[in-house]
Amino acid sequence: MDLMPTPEQDAIRDSVRAFLDAELPMSRVRALCGAAGDAYAPLWRAAAELGFFADYALTEQMVLFEELGRALAPGPWLGTVIAAQALAGGTDAAAAAVFGGETRVALCLDPVGGPLTLRSGRLSGTRRAVLGAGLADAFLVVDDAGVLFVPRDAGVRVEATPSLDATNPVGTVTFTDAATTRLPSDAALLRRAAVVLACAEAVGGIARTVEMSVEYAKVRQQFGKPIGSFQAVKHRCADMAVRAEVARSATIYAAVSVRDGAADADFQVSVAKVLCANAYLQNAADNVQNHGGMGFTWECDAHLFVKRSRAFDATIGPRRAQLDSLVAQFRAA
């Protein structure tokens, strides 16, 4: 299995990074915190023109999400990309709106909020901790019963939920006889893909914490020397870099396993989630420490990655659930 990036993936990375550097500097990420969904419309349309919602293979989508995570991009990117995958080949207005960046889609993946009921095409029930719920125009529900596309119309109520991560707001979505469209997609495959792409987004954030720490360690001086010359700081940065590479390797392996339909795909996805969550939580905390007292201030961006790491740990296939899955798979082996 070749895990090295292809020239096409390198080209995607360069293109996406240039776009995000121009359109989503950290100042704009901060400005979008608490903004309504309409504030995202120009960004979504520009991203669609660049092909963000095109039908790429999972390994190429992973590159996209690494860059989104590196930029700490706010908004329901994961839900929209997974919805585009579920709608691939569709020709109706709903599909065209997603592909064209006119519709933002939030993903209802984690079964938090109790069971959902579907009767005569009408959905009822609640999903909590839905990332980007308040910014979405529609919802993609991935459930044991199948894959449902639900426009945000009558019968759909969204309530904002207090969240540690202001760059990635969450909400509670209540469906009351909401109209749905059942999609002929494999729910298990979409679930695996969603967790892999969430891991890829985390990998980008993990890598960015390494960059931030190394950059700061080169310029911040104590006792007449850059702090990066001191063993305590340089070893911490080295440990961060190792965790970043482990997380990236596990996520690439999981992406390839899912793409190729490997028998152990579920196992690899769970491993990637656990390793990425552990790495992100630790790297984000170490990044704050490497910045010293400044790292604890609102003005320093380090705390934003701490908050994103906490949100990643608890959503889109939470780490604790993946650990339970790994234990069950080991016992069944």
Tell what function each PLM region has.
Residues 90-93, 120-122, 181-183, 259-264:
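Short, glycine- and charge-enriched coil/turn segments that flank and shape catalytic ligand pockets
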Residues 5, 77, 118, 123, ...:
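Short clusters of hydrophobic/aromatic residues that line enzyme substrate/ligand-binding pockets
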Residues 141, 174, 200-203:
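Well-ordered beta-strand segments characteristic of repetitive beta-sheet solenoids
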Residues 188-189:
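Residues forming anionic-ligand binding surfaces in small-molecule and nucleic-acid pockets
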Residues 1-71, 192-333:
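Alpha-helical interface subdomain recognition
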Residues 127-132, 152-185:
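Flexible, small-/acidic-enriched active-site or ligand-binding loops
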Residues 21-160:
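Glycine-rich flavin
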